[in-house]
């Protein structure tokens, strides 16, 4: 699917890889201008389409997901060149997986948030998009729940 989308959109300098995102790849250190970390999540943002999610959720699973997300962010952060971009996204509305991960990441890595406004429709512009992140909510934004943050490496 990713390869199809790269071809469909005319991507010429895009490389999709199948690998374990929790395992460090030294050949990728500071090699990418942009890294997209679309991490595994609880899926609470798509619960309308997958109602079984609410029956499988537990506090322990939530903690495990957050730890997995942070392991992936740790590796992804190392692959971005100085002044490069890291995009972090989930399909959840859980604060622990979204805003709290952003705060954790900023505290532990040499990155800053960067405005999303130039990249999203004007009707989605708000205080948080100027800061560098956006939480889409079902019923408000006419979409599934989704979170995205844009980081710039210092």
Question: What name fits each language-model region?
Answer:
Residues 1-154:
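S-adenosylmethionine
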